[in-house]
């Protein structure tokens, strides 16, 4: 863990501890309750989509963005490390096994990416743990990621593959940018009955629509592609967005989703430290993760949440 988590020490008093000081290896998880980070440190899907090099470094950059934040009272935090496999298909399979294993220990998985092809791996892990549940996937993203995978999987094919394979999954996207998606992709989304919420829609309408979406689901998986945010706030991504979502708006939407108490997994993808400025993107991801963890403590009461969902 010392290789993944480190930082300065103010003191060893409980109220002075930083996050990096309390993270433990998953092997130390002896009882249910807590969160577990897992790194999806591959950029193979992005490179297949003709993106830029660097997202494989995103998982560790997010850890760095989290390290100096205050520890959270009454929350156990573990880490499963990064992937051994870097090829997209092998990485997705390894990641899915780790997600399923995290559930077997009664922990809440938080994925750190890496390409947005993390989605298919996460879905497979969730489905292994919850074989009969109706899954709602909510994606914060400027792009639909619903391209054809006939030739090969990329960072933009996961949702089409999931919807083709599983009739018990529904997909919603918030932060959608019409100018970032072709007409054929929009048509594909319409055919798959995707709930598409454009970035410029009123915040109240977006939150109301997502709450209605969640009501129909047994469990919810949230995935946040960091290019959903405006390039000024999140420059360190593979495909920066012009006129993207305001970060504070994104935080409010995330809070509303977490308050439904149906979220069982969340991940943060497409962070590319090589293109970041003053670590803005990785720090923003860190703040969103911190927000998530605080909500988990407040809303889920970790000792019971997993058994209730199962």
Put a short name on every predicted segment.
Residues 2-310:
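Conserved alpha-helical scaffold segments that buttress catalytic/binding sites
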């Amino acid at each position: 863990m010392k290789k993944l988590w480190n930082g300065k020490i103010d003191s060893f008093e409980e109220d002075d501890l930083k996050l990096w000081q309390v993270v433990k290896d998953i092997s130390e998880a002896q009882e249910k309750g807590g969160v577990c980070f897992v790194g999806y440190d591959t950029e193979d899907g992005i490179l297949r989509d003709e993106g830029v090099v660097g997202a494989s470094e995103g998982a560790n950059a997010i850890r760095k963005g989290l390290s100096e934040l205050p520890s959270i009272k009454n929350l156990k935090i573990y880490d499963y490390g990064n992937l051994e496999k870097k090829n997209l298909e092998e990485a997705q399979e390894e990641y899915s096994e780790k997600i399923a294993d995290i559930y077997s220990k009664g922990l809440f998985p938080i994925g750190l990416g890496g390409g947005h092809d993390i989605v298919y791996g996460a879905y497979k892990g969730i489905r292994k743990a919850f074989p009969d549940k109706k899954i709602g996937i909510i994606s914060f993203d400027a792009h639909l990621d619903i391209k054809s995978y006939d030739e090969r999987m990329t960072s933009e094919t996961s949702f089409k593959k999931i919807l083709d394979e599983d009739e018990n999954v529904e997909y919603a996207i918030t932060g959608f940018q019409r100018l970032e998606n072709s007409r054929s992709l929009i048509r594909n989304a319409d055919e798959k009955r995707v709930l598409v919420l454009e970035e410029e829609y009123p915040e109240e309408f977006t939150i109301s629509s997502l709450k209605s979406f969640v009501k129909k689901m047994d469990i919810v998986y949230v995935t946040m592609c960091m290019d959903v945010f405006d390039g000024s706030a999140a420059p360190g991504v593979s495909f920066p967005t012009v006129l993207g979502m305001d970060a504070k708006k994104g935080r409010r939407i995330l809070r509303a989703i977490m308050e439904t108490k149906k979220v069982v997994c969340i991940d943060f993808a497409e962070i590319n430290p090589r293109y970041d400025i003053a670590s803005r993107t990785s720090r923003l991801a860190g703040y969103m993760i911190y927000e998530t963890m605080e909500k988990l403590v407040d809303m889920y009461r970790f000792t019971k949440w997993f058994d209730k969902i199962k």
